[in-house]
Regions:
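Short S/T/G/P-rich N-terminal loop/turn motif that feeds into the first structured element of a domain
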Residues: 36-271
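Intrinsically disordered, low-complexity segments enriched in Ser/Pro/Gly/Ala and basic residues
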Residues: 1, 13, 29, 37-38
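Short, Lys/Arg-enriched N-terminal segments with co-localized hydrophobic residues
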Residues: 3-20
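Sec-dependent signal peptide recognition
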Residues: 21-29
């Protein structure tokens, strides 16, 4: 079932790695929370809920400017505050390459799918018309391009992370004869390396998460075996971290069991 979407409108999900554009999205401040139970079981309000991060592709219009975007961010934040939505935060992600599908991504972070659904429904009923009028000609959502994921923390976020950051999405498929056990072994070895690196060079701003899609693949997008998201607090930390990483055998180990594509982005916190 397909739905035309506005910025906060109730939609179905799809996973995106199309031929022209593999993916754009980012997570900041993710929560590691256990999965929800079966829908056939009674709801336990005390049970942990699954955090959700979703990405809304945006296309610039003829009247776009950075100043106009800032005014719209302020207006959107006022609406979200007035609506009282249970939202962890929001970011904007700009690809550091040239996708032909969109110009930037608006990222929404929720403590649960229930909180997400309530906010989308309430926003549509109370603010949608005004919001669409305000941003007409400046930017627009891409139809159907709203994508949700469940995050799991691989390395804790460091205190050095601020309102701007660098992110890199690694879309990976296992090579023939390899699988999850090889990824698990690599993550253990990588964690040991990070511990040693921090002891030698001090604590940096690097952290990472694994992202699992909450939807079925579509004609435009196919699943990969795993999705690894790296995050740094600055471009300088990213470059120096990669330089030290290149002196190890870890990349060779990773290339042995899987083949990955990297997609770099710059991001900033807007809520």
């Amino acid at each position: 079932m397909s739905h035309k979407i506005n910025f906060l409108n109730h939609v179905k999900f799809s996973f995106f790695i199309g031929d022209k554009m593999k993916v754009i999205y980012i997570l900041m401040g993710c929560l590691l929370i256990t999965a929800c139970g079966s829908s056939n079981e009674p709801v336990d309000s005390s049970a942990p809920q699954t955090a959700v991060v979703e990405y809304v592709w945006q296309t610039k219009g003829p009247n776009y400017s950075d100043e106009a975007l800032e005014k719209l961010i302020d207006s959107w934040n006022e609406k979200v505050t007035e609506g009282g939505y249970d939202m962890i935060g929001a970011n904007i992600l700009v690809p550091q390459f040239q996708p032909d599908t969109h110009d930037f991504v608006w990222v929404l972070r929720w403590p649960s799918m229930e909180a997400r659904d309530y906010a989308w429904d309430h926003f549509q009923a109370n603010y949608d018309q005004e919001w669409n009028k305000e941003r007409a000609g400046i930017f627009s959502d891409n139809d159907e391009d709203v994508y949700a994921f469940s995050p799991s923390l691989g390395r804790p976020m460091k205190a050095g992370n601020g309102n701007t950051f660098e992110a890199e999405f690694n879309f990976c498929n296992y090579n023939e004869g390899y699988g999850e056990s090889d990824l698990k072994k690599f993550r253990q070895d990588f964690g040991d390396y990070l511990d040693e690196d921090e002891m030698e060079n001090g604590e940096g701003t690097f952290w990472y998460v694994m992202l699992d899609p909450l939807f079925e693949p579509t004609a435009n997008v196919q699943h990969t075996d795993y999705l690894w998201l790296n995050i740094w607090g600055s471009k300088e930390d990213k470059d120096s971290g990669y330089a030290r990483y290149a002196e190890t055998d870890l990349q060779t180990q990773a290339d042995t069991f899987s083949t990955c594509q990297r997609f770099p982005h710059s991001g900033r916190v807007i809520r």
